[in-house]
Structure formats: structure tokens, C-alpha cells
């Protein structure tokens, strides 16, 4: 089963595609860099990026839910990105699953309060990856895909 994991962001949107059989394997990972200045063009850039990475062989899509932020403007902008992303996934795939950062951290590290670096360490360990994976948006997206693989018991 192929799973697309997505870590939404307003500057970088991490993505990862994993295969679950015969064992968890990383197929592709990266990020969509948002460089436009105006919101409408940023959203368009995000959608174009999703269209470039999505292919019909993907069986499941999992997206990390919005985290709590102190700045209301940040939350609002992230919610707009998340809404555009959700709509596009529904249009091209039909459905998706959502996981909170707490659920993802707990699934991958056993600790819902783990730091991003701890998540990255465990992602590399689970997949047997040597070396660094940068930026951390990518390891977060991989962690979302791993979390989904555990939930659907593939």
C-alpha cells in the first residue's frame, strides 16, 4: 500500500510517499516551497505542487492537523493553506485521514511531547535511513505517513 503523508506549512509543505509491503520503505520525499508573496498565489503554488507529486498509484493520504499557535494571523493563514490542500486532495483522491501532531509524535516516538529532532531520529530508525533528512518538514511528513500505516494496519 502506498501512503502519501503531508505536513502542511505556509513556507514549506513537507510530503512523503511510503510503501508498506513487504516492509515500510520510503519511495519519495521532499517539500513544496512557497515563494509567492500574495496569499492567492501562495495557495495556487501549493496546489500546483500537490498536483506534481500526486499520482494515481497512491492508496491512502494522511495530513497532519493544524497545531496550536500563539499568533492568530499564523493560525488563520495555516487554516487557509490547510483548507486549499484538503479541497485539492478531495478532488484528486476522494478522501484523506487527519492526525494531530500529538498523535503523530506518540505513534512514531511513543511520546506525544517529543521534539522534532526526536521524531526525525525515529523516522530514520524505523525506515533504516542513514544520514540526515532536511528540512524537518520532510521527516514530519514521513512520520504522518508512518502513523497512518499503523492506524490502517497495512
Curated annotation (Swiss-Prot):
EC number(s) on file: 3.1.21.10
Binding residues annotated for Mg(2+) 2, in chain numbering: 64
Keywords on record: Cytoplasm, DNA damage, DNA recombination, DNA repair, DNA-binding, Endonuclease, Hydrolase, Magnesium, Metal-binding, Nuclease
Name of the top EC class for this enzyme: hydrolase
PROSITE patterns the UniProt entry points to: RUVC
Subcellular location: Cytoplasm
Record text on cofactor binding: Binds 2 Mg(2+) ion per subunit.
SUPFAM superfamilies reported in the protein's UniProt record: Ribonuclease H-like
SS bond list: none
GO CC field: cytoplasm; Holliday junction resolvase complex
GO molecular function, one term: DNA binding
Active site: 7, 64, 137
Chief localization: cytoplasm
Catalytic activity: Endonucleolytic cleavage at a junction such as a reciprocal single-stranded crossover between two homologous DNA duplexes (Holliday junction)
GO biological process terms held by the UniProt record: DNA recombination; DNA repair
Residues holding Mg(2+) 1: 7, 137
A Pfam family matched in the record: RuvC
Cofactor: Mg(2+)
Homology family: Belongs to the RuvC family.
NCBIfam families: ruvC (TIGR00228)
Biological function: The RuvA-RuvB-RuvC complex processes Holliday junction (HJ) DNA during genetic recombination and DNA repair. Endonuclease that resolves HJ intermediates. Cleaves cruciform DNA by making single-stranded nicks across the HJ at symmetrical positions within the homologous arms, yielding a 5'-phosphate and a 3'-hydroxyl group; requires a central core of homology in the junction. The consensus cleavage sequence is 5'-(A/T)TT(C/G)-3'. Cleavage occurs on the 3'-side of the TT dinucleotide at the point of strand exchange.
Quaternary assembly: Homodimer which binds Holliday junction (HJ) DNA. The HJ becomes 2-fold symmetrical on binding to RuvC with unstacked arms; it has a different conformation from HJ DNA in complex with RuvA. In the full resolvosome a probable DNA-RuvA(4)-RuvB(12)-RuvC(2) complex forms which resolves the HJ.
Name this polypeptide is given: Crossover junction endodeoxyribonuclease RuvC
Protein encoded by which gene: ruvC
Amino acid at each position: 500500500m502506498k501512503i502519501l503523508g503531508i505536513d502542511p506549512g505556509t513556507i514549506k509543505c513537507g510530503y512523503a510517499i511510503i510503501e508498506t509491503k513487504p516492509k515500510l520503505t520510503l519511495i519519495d520525499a521532499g517539500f513544496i516551497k512557497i515563494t509567492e508573496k500574495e496569499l492567492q498565489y501562495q495557495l495556487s503554488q501549493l496546489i500546483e505542487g500537490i498536483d506534481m507529486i500526486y499520482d494515481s498509484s497512491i492508496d491512502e493520504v494522511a495530513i497532519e492537523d493544524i497545531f496550536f499557535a500563539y499568533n492568530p494571523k499564523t493560525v488563520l493563514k495555516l487554516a487557509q493553506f490547510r483548507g486549499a490542500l484538503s479541497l485539492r486532495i478531495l478532488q484528486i483522491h476522494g478522501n484523506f485521514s487527519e492526525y494531530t501532531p500529538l498523535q503523530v509524535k506518540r505513534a512514531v516516538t511513543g511520546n506525544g511531547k517529543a521534539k522534532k529532532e526526536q521524531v526525525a531520529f525515529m523516522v530514520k530508525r524505523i525506515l533504516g535511513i542513514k544520514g540526515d533528512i532536511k528540512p524537518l518538514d520532510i521527516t514530519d511528513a514521513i512520520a504522518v505517513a508512518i502513523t497512518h500505516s499503523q492506524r490502517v494496519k497495512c
